[in-house]
Amino acid sequence: MPKFRHLLEKHNIGEKIFTDIRDRLEESGLLMHGGTIVDATIISAPSSTKNRTGTRDPEMHQTKKGNQWYHGMKVHAVVDAGTGYIHTIEGMAANVHDSTEATKLIREDDHVVYGDSGYLGVPKQEDVIKDEHLSQIDYRICKRPSSLKTSKDYEGINWEKQMENRISSIRCKVEHAFLIVKRDFGYRKVAYRGIAKNMNRFHVLFGCANLLMCIRAGRTEQFRNKQVAPMAG
């Protein structure tokens, strides 16, 4: 089995499986364009040195989220804002800030991008400001909760908070993809040393997550036939 896995990794079979599933969704009309949701999740790695080499994985790093420290890698999942299907994933060390990788994950025809407060700095990045496409995108990024507070005696509607709730209701689609991989598939910790080896598996897992979402939505017939059923009415 290890030899077979190494063969899959060598030829990037995991990524090819993910790409094939995504392309089939697109050809079936089940994957839309124009809007993208970006998010990242931390996948824990053993911090122990109790292994064959007696050392930690040099590609895994520590990062702080809230008041808690994590050791491992980070996976960015980028989903279609219209359907929730995953169109891109990217892996990196856990200590890489979300905003530094965001622009690499945006499609050429995206004109709206949703994200949490970790991506607040994206519109201000120099490469975004100077890029003809990236600078024209509408970045709908959730603000930090602390910036939405009103005085205790304020009796009106907090419209800013209402807008944030609206953005969050769209952005939560990406959480569904992570939920499938972590809860349904049980992949909460890295299985191998090195980001590339783990990403080979993540490509397969997120590809399967797309299939599962397609099945749950009752769209398997369209997926198999690569065509969308005519709309009623």
What are the roles of these predicted feature ranges?
Residues 208-220:
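Membrane-helix cytosolic exit motif
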Residues 178, 191-192, 210, 230-233:
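Intrinsic disorder/low-complexity segments
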Residues 101, 150-151, 217:
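Extended hydrophobic-aromatic, low-complexity segments
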Residues 111-112, 117-200:
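Helix-centered, glycine/charged polyanion-binding patches within enzymatic domains
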Residues 217-233:
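A short, flexible helix-boundary coil/loop motif
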Residues 1-133, 144, 203-210:
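Polybasic low-complexity intrinsically disordered regions
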